[in-house]
Regions:
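Extreme N-terminal starter segment of soluble prokaryotic enzymes
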Residues: 1-4
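Histidine-anchored nucleotide/phosphate-binding helix
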Residues: 15-25, 188-192, 196
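A short, glycine/small-residue-rich beta-strand->loop->alpha-helix junction that serves as a flexible
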Residues: 7-16
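Secretory-pathway luminal glycosyltransferase catalytic domains
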Residues: 45-194, 198-199
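Short, well-ordered beta-to-alpha junction loops that form the rim of enzyme active sites
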Residues: 36-38, 165-166, 207-210
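Leloir-type glycosyltransferase catalytic cores
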Residues: 278-295
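A short beta-strand-loop structural module common to alpha/beta enzyme folds
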Residues: 30-41
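Donor-binding and catalytic core of enzymes assembling or modifying cell-surface/extracellular glycoconjugates
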Residues: 11, 193-272, 277-280
Length: 295
């Protein structure tokens, strides 16, 4: 028996899928493989990014994918067909597609070789090995000179707050805007007000895929702040730097989610948007860990 987990999306999504694979293989006491198929449409936009971390990610070969390769080549058709099929879990037990964002314990009950397709965006899938996940996600390469300076600044700041803003694809892609939406200036104003409560002398470290926008938007912030300009090519360093802060404001982004989650401190404060998508069809009650504050 082995499991294969489909990889898709950006770094935050990839981390969820790897953590899910890592956890389910541990629970089922079996091996796992990651399907990072280059024909996957997601990778025309996003790159495979887990190789920046010192983790062993067993990638599926063509031989491993022999019985599933047709799923990838006809992914959209098969995905639609599977969703419409009655008794699909009985007729096709080797294929498991995530139906909602809500934790589904059925995933842990598979008994044969299974191909898993989903985002798995809830800590509940890997909370049992949370400490292991955090300890394993260390960077392969030393920080760049720029990021090292930022880390030193964070470490010298008793009350460092990471603030994440995701804009580029959510604002400029009409499909993403309609489905996902993005956090408003009012959200950030309310989140800042809440996160500094009982916190003397906060210093904000602002991370974003739109550096120019955050520089302009937060110029009147009444607290010391630093806008980080690593860019997409160093987003894994941003993730590490975010985790070094003691409090966090995240956007409706899996990347921001991981930046806050990787902070192992039990007393950390995390402020997150209560609405993750524009559509109300997606149940996200399990997306945010217990204790995170919704605004």
């Amino acid at each position: 028996m082995s499991i294969i987990v489909r990889m898709k999306g950006g770094l935050g999504n990839q981390l969820f899928q790897w953590a899910f694979a890592r956890s389910i293989s541990s629970r089922l006491k079996t091996s796992y493989l990651i399907d990072w198929a280059p024909f996957s449409p997601e990778f025309k936009v996003h790159k495979y990014s887990l190789d920046h971390f010192a983790i062993k990610v067993p990638l599926a070969t063509n031989t491993d994918m022999f019985g599933f390769v047709w799923i990838g080549r006809h992914y959209k058709f098969f995905n639609t067909f599977y969703r419409l099929m009655r008794f699909r879990r009985v007729l096709m037990p080797f294929y498991y597609i995530e139906r909602t964002f809500v934790f589904d314990p059925v995933a842990f009950s598979k008994t044969g070789t299974t191909y898993f397709d989903g985002f798995w965006q809830t800590e509940k899938y890997f909370k049992n090995i949370a400490d292991e996940i955090r300890s394993e996600l260390t960077l392969v390469e030393p920080l760049s000179h720029y990021s090292k300076k930022i880390e030193e600044e964070i470490q010298s700041t008793p009350n460092a707050v990471s603030l994440h803003v995701r804009r580029t694809d959510l604002v400029h892609n009409p499909v993403m805007t309609a489905f996902h939406g993005y956090c408003s200036p009012e959200f950030y104003a309310a989140a800042i007000k809440r996160v500094v409560k009982d916190m003397p002398s906060p210093h904000f470290f602002i991370f974003s895929d739109d550096y120019e926008w955050v520089v302009g938007h937060f110029k009147s912030l009444p607290y010391p702040y630093t806008c980080i300009k690593n860019g997409a090519n160093k987003n894994y360093e941003d993730l590490y730097l975010m985790s070094r802060c003691c409090r966090h404001i995240i956007s409706n982004s899996s990347f921001g989610w991981w930046g806050a989650w990787l902070n192992p401190k039990k007393d950390k404060v995390v402020i997150a948007p209560s609405k993750w998508f524009v559509t109300t069809k997606n149940d996200t009650k399990d997306l945010l860990p217990e204790g995170w504050i919704k605004i």
